[in-house]
A protein has these predicted regions:
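Short, well-ordered loop/turn elements at secondary-structure boundaries
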Residues: 85-87, 97-99, 150-152
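Conserved catalytic-core segments centered on acid/base and nucleophilic motifs
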Residues: 89-93, 145-148
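Active-site beta-strand-loop-beta-strand hairpin of nuclease catalytic cores
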Residues: 92-117, 121
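Nuclease-adjacent, charged terminal/linker segments that flank catalytic cores
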Residues: 1-87, 217-224
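General "foldedness" signal
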Residues: 66, 117-120, 167-171
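Non-catalytic C-terminal interaction segments of nucleic acid-processing enzymes
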Residues: 1-35, 125, 131-224
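A cross-family glycoside hydrolase active-site/sugar-binding cleft signature
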Residues: 80, 105, 158
Length: 224
C-alpha cells in the first residue's frame, strides 16, 4: 500500500474540508496547527486508533454513564469545569441534589512522529506514544479520583479498548470501585460501546506505583 494513499490510511475528518469543520462537533477542528493538519484517528497495527477526544462525540457517552450511575435520575451536564488546578471534561449533576454528581473524562491516544508522513515520506512515521498516554491518564485518574473521593463522586473514563487493554487492568476489577472505565471499540464504521470495568482507586495506585518501582529498579540494574 502506498503511504500517499491517504484515504486507506487515515480517517481525516475535518482536514478534507476547505472550511476545516470537525465532522463530530460542527465546529472548527481543534487539531489544526500552522504546520500540520488535524486528524481524528489513524490506522496503527490494523486498528483505527482514536487520537482526538471529539471523535467520542459521535456517541451519547453521557447518557450511557448516567444510566449506569444515576439510574433514571434527572440530571444536568456541565462542560469543561475548572476547579483549582483541575479541569473536568464533563460534570453530571443530579437536578434534585447538587452534591450528587460524577465526572466524565475523555481519553485518547497520544502520538509521536508527524502527520505529514502520510503526505511526505521524508517525515518520521506517525505512531502511538503508549508511555506518554499512560503517564498522563494514570496521573489524572489518581489525582482527580482522590479529589472526587472526598465527595463520594465517581470518575468515569471514556477510552478505546486498545488503550484499556494496554493497561491490563481487567484483573483488578472492583464491583463498586470509584473509577469506571467505559470502553469502546472502533473496528467498524461506527464506534461501539464494548464494556464497562469498575476499579478501586487504591488498587490502581498500587498497581502503577509498583510498576514504576520495577521500572526504576530495572534501569538501575542495567547500569550496574
Amino acid at each position: 500500500m502506498q503511504k500517499k494513499d491517504v484515504n486507506n490510511v487515515l480517517n481525516i475528518g475535518a482536514t478534507r474540508q476547505e472550511n476545516q469543520i470537525c465532522p463530530h462537533t460542527n465546529k472548527k477542528c481543534i487539531k489544526l496547527s500552522k504546520t500540520e493538519k488535524g486528524i481524528c484517528s489513524f490506522i496503527f497495527k490494523d486498528t483505527s486508533q482514536i487520537i482526538c477526544p471529539n471523535y467520542f462525540k459521535k456517541i451519547d457517552f453521557v447518557k450511557y454513564a448516567a444510566d449506569i450511575i444515576f439510574s433514571g435520575k434527572n440530571y444536568k451536564v456541565i462542560k469543561e469545569l475548572k476547579y483549582k488546578d483541575n479541569y473536568f471534561d464533563y460534570v453530571i449533576v443530579n437536578n434534585e441534589n447538587h452534591s450528587d454528581f460524577f465526572v466524565i473524562e475523555l481519553q485518547t491516544l497520544d502520538t509521536c512522529g508527524s502527520y505529514k508522513y502520510f503526505y511526505n515520506t521524508s517525515n518520521k512515521p506517525l505512531t502511538v506514544n503508549w508511555k506518554t498516554t499512560e503517564k498522563n491518564l494514570i496521573s489524572q485518574i489518581i489525582e482527580k479520583g482522590a479529589l472526587l473521593k472526598n465527595y463520594e463522586a465517581k470518575l468515569v473514563v471514556v477510552l478505546q479498548n486498545t488503550l484499556f487493554d494496554y493497561f491490563n487492568l481487567d484483573n483488578i476489577e472492583t464491583p463498586d470501585g470509584e473509577i469506571i472505565f467505559m470502553i469502546y471499540n472502533n473496528n467498524s464504521k461506527n464506534i461501539n460501546f464494548e464494556r464497562k470495568v469498575c476499579a478501586s482507586l487504591e488498587l490502581i495506585k498500587n498497581r502503577f506505583n509498583t510498576c514504576n518501582k520495577l521500572d526504576l529498579i530495572e534501569i538501575i540494574s542495567k547500569k550496574l
